[in-house]
Regions:
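Conserved, structured C-terminal
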Residues: 1-195
């Protein structure tokens, strides 16, 4: 037997578990899971599949969508902050200072209106335009085969909200060509992740 610490959480927006095991036993556990998983049609999943699944669910990625340059309020992660308990945590004082300040940028989700698999290739750092003015930059991009759409995350300047951008001409520039996008109000996969 292999002693495993299982956490019910998922980076991809589906019911899942992260398994923690002593590294010397990881190969044994992997082989057990693959063998037993045959009865449940278990299959391997690649990095790009995991990446688009987390994007479909609106999950941000450290290093792409959030970094030391952004804070939880800008990234739409206010729900993850609680000041109710008398508990100190790293960054609490900095967050309290900006808690009531106006955001200078905010994270949004976009889909290209004309989507083809992998075309254009969305990565990150593509400019986001309203008409001919740059209003932000993308942070992640990928093609969703489940929803048949190119999906992108990005930050837009202060004053822009889903409501204010909804009826505007919004574009993402990829390889010097502008592609019209739709601003999403909620993730494509908007399951209740609490159950």
């Amino acid at each position: 037997g292999v002693k495993v610490w299982a956490q019910r959480l998922s980076y991809v927006g589906e019911l899942g578990f992260e398994l923690y095991v002593d590294s010397s036993l990881a190969k044994d556990l992997y082989e057990i899971l693959i063998e037993e998983g045959k009865n449940f049609e278990l299959s391997h999943c690649g990095m790009h599949a995991m990446d688009i699944m987390r994007m479909e669910s609106g999950f941000v990625h450290w290093g792409h969508d959030i970094s030391p340059e952004e804070n939880q309020y800008q990234a739409g992660l206010k729900f993850a902050i609680s000041y109710k308990k008398n508990v100190n945590f790293i960054g609490k004082d900095a967050l309290l200072k900006i808690k009531d300040q106006k955001l200078d940028k905010r994270m949004m989700m976009f889909t290209l209106k004309d989507s083809k698999p992998g075309e254009p290739l969305l990565l990150h750092e593509e400019p986001i335009y309203m008409d001919n003015k740059i209003i932000g930059r993308t942070t992640s991009g990928n093609y969703s085969f489940c929803y048949e759409k190119n999906l992108s995350f990005g930050y837009v300047n202060s004053g822009n909200t889903v409501e204010t951008l909804k009826d505007k001409n919004i574009y993402i520039e990829i390889e010097k060509q502008k592609y019209p996008v739709e601003v999403l109000e909620k993730p494509l996969n908007n399951k209740d992740f609490k159950n």
